[in-house]
Amino acid sequence: MDKRHDPSRRIIAPTGTKLSCKSWLTEAPMRMLMNNLHPDVAERPEDLVVYGGIGRAARDWECYDKIVEVLQRLEDDETLMVQSGKPVGVFKTHSNAPRVIIANSNLVPHWANWEHFNELDKKGLAMYGQMTAGSWIYIGSQGIVQGTYETFVAMAKQHFNGVSAGKWILTGGLGGMGGAQPLAGTMAGYSVLTCEVDETRIDFRLRTKYVDKKATSLDEALAMIEEANNSGKPVSVGLLANAADVFAELVERGITPDVVTDQTSAHDPLNGYLPQGWTLEYAAEMRKKDEAAVVKAAKQSMAVQVKAMLALQAAGAATTDYGNNIRQMAFEEGVENAFDFPGFVPAYVRPLFCEGIGPFRWVALSGDPEDIYKTDAKVKELIPDNPQLHNWLDMARERIAFQGLPSRICWVGLKDRARLALAFNEMVKNGELSAPIVIGRDHLDSGSVASPNRETESMLDGSDAVSDWPLMNALLNTASGATWVSLHHGGGVGMGFSQHSGVVIVADGTDDAAVRLGRVLWNDPATGVMRHADAGYDIAKNCAKEQGLDLPML
């Protein structure tokens, strides 16, 4: 019997102001853990899988139940330790310490590979936490919509003189992360064709308004794209097909998209990528019989897809890796020039990271969408001179369906995060908001990740693989008084390729919370400015100077 599978479970977080725990500082992590497993949020909630292949919220259902039980009895001077999704200890700390400290999927470097992890996983000794799955701050596909939108806008500026109208994007994957690309693309003015092998995922994205139409053949999908481009109204199409097949067929036909990328779960060749010619059912059987054969077949198909991406790049498509490590997988399968197209961070996002700008997100524990709309207005009030941000907030309200607890994400940096958090806390205090707000971020941020094939690819000083930075980030956020802190390995790009940390803090309207919020939400993005300034980026050095950071070696 698989202790991780229970189709009878239907988890929905409590809403309103009635507490199940002893304070909001423990109620918040409990609700956010539950929200990660909401049926409208998680990819496979019955298996505790939130997103990203096998990114889980808890190691098994027994561990999940025990985490909830402990949070409900935890005092405000105690800290729960969670080791790879398992609650292993409660310790006396103090009221400004984190209520939960989480470590997921971490392995000694020599053993940091999928083979060793999968053995531990089968024995019930480990859990893959992805980034926000095991750190309980996943908010559905909205979580990366704005970052993806900003990337596509940057691509239009860089490649198409700022004009995306009449252009189209080819990509793959409609899981929790990939599902953001169709909506982000149409928001940025492109049409989008996304390949997906699992029809239930296409239907999920249709239901949550991330995809406009479904197609079952390439010809049908291309006709939809052509019609949209002719009409001037962008459309997103979910095509039921294998990305490797479609990408290669487009090369064969001589059809070149304007933008090419991919967000299948290529980071996990065993669980995340369907080989060409295989059905989902056959892949599930093969995973039980011969894992090595599955991995080999998946990597062979990834090689086909990456070769097609390179060919489309040569034909004129703006081509980028969107952070799923597909280039590495293809390289290991013999595609020697797999890295000839860039990752999206060095190509489009790094200047933002240099100013500590990244995916700031917040969640209304009340469950009331009005709380989010009020915070949207507060963001506009406090940041009046950023039309791109205002445009994003307007589009998000109009086009993004909340999944689970109402939430919002917007990319803001060092100079704004603490200001916004303190304003939200004041809104809770004076009753403008009906319940506390949880504030967090993705692990994909400026100072919280070491990932040489993604966030820290091609660093100016060659420090791509130095992972001291996310470790220091987690330690500093713990010392600063975050409500929960996490340290993970392997998120986004798979085992052996990344280390990263997460932070979440509660704005409960108290004066103590204001002190913690001011510290945490200054220090956290400041570590990103520090990291990039140390690597030699002038934008980061100037930001550090302007914001008065004390960086002794600069």
Curated annotation (Swiss-Prot):
Positions with a binding annotation for NAD(+): 52-53, 130, 176-178, 196, 201, 242-243, 263-267, 273-274, 322, 492
A GO CC annotation given for this chain: cytoplasm
Catalysed reactions, as listed in the record: 4-imidazolone-5-propanoate = trans-urocanate + H2O
Cross-referenced Gene3D superfamilies: Urocanase like domains, Urocanase superfamily
Active site: C410
Pathway(s) annotated for this protein in UniProt: Amino-acid degradation; L-histidine degradation into L-glutamate; N-formimidoyl-L-glutamate from L-histidine: step 2/3
Subcellular location: Cytoplasm
GO molecular function: urocanate hydratase activity
Cofactor requirements of the protein: NAD(+)
EC number: 4.2.1.49
Matching Pfam families: Urocanase, Urocanase_C, Urocanase_N
UniProt-listed NCBIfam families: hutU, PRK05414.1
Record's function text: Catalyzes the conversion of urocanate to 4-imidazolone-5-propionate.
Protein name, entry field: Urocanate hydratase
Gene that this polypeptide is encoded by: hutU
